[in-house]
Regions:
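Beta-strand-rich interaction surfaces with strong enrichment in secreted/lumenal proteins
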Residues: 25-28, 84-89, 120-122
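Short, aromatic/His-centered strand-loop micro-motif at the edge of beta-sheets
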Residues: 73-96
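Short strand-turn-strand beta-turns centered on an Asx-Gly dipeptide
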Residues: 79-80, 102, 110-113
Length: 176
């Protein structure tokens, strides 16, 4: 935990990000082939710009990011390509999100167990920096303001059935 991240007992435990400079770093990097990132979140503010939530950053070219993009929609971004969710994220509301990408580049975003976006993303650059939760230390002003109680990384592209199963396993905890 770095800077403005606090732990709360709310909903059986959650990380609370201040939206200023707080983030969590993990040595766990995304696979360069198949992967999924799953997390539960509650955003405290709407954004007119970008709030980075999860991702591997790179000193060289490229990055892999999952964020809240302009107009408060989820986005999966890899090396200049992106897919954007259709659902507008409301403040003060809990959501379960899953981002997937398979080795052929097919990417999907699931929100509360339902597919919210699909498309093709470029290849993943091998990470030379840490996986970050709650912010992007290579850019300024892109910090998450809200709560993230659960974050999981998989070395496979979860199926629609698996994304729904994981949502169903968490929905009562967060009133989804």
């Amino acid at each position: 935990l770095t800077n403005g991240v606090a732990f709360s007992n709310e909903n059986e435990g959650t990380w609370d990000f201040d939206g200023v400079d707080g983030y969590i770093t993990s040595s766990r990097a995304l696979s360069t082939n198949n992967y999924s990132a799953e997390f539960v979140f509650n955003a405290d503010v709407n954004t007119s710009g970008t709030e980075h939530w999860l991702g591997n950053q790179y000193q060289g070219s490229g990055r892999t990011i999952f964020d809240l993009y302009t107009n408060n929609r989820l986005r999966s971004f890899i090396n200049g390509t992106s897919i954007n969710g259709a659902t507008t994220i409301e403040t003060g509301t809990w959501y379960h999100a899953v981002f997937t990408r398979n080795s052929s580049g097919l990417a999907k975003i699931y929100l509360n167990g339902v597919q919210d976006a699909t498309g093709t993303l470029s290849s993943v650059t091998p990470s030379d920096l840490a996986f970050e939760i709650g912010g992007d230390t290579t850019l300024t002003g892109r910090w998450f303001n809200g709560k993230i109680p659960l974050c999981r990384i998989y070395n496979k592209a979860l199926t629609a059935a698996e994304a729904l199963q994981n949502f169903n396993a968490q929905k009562s905890r967060f009133g989804l």
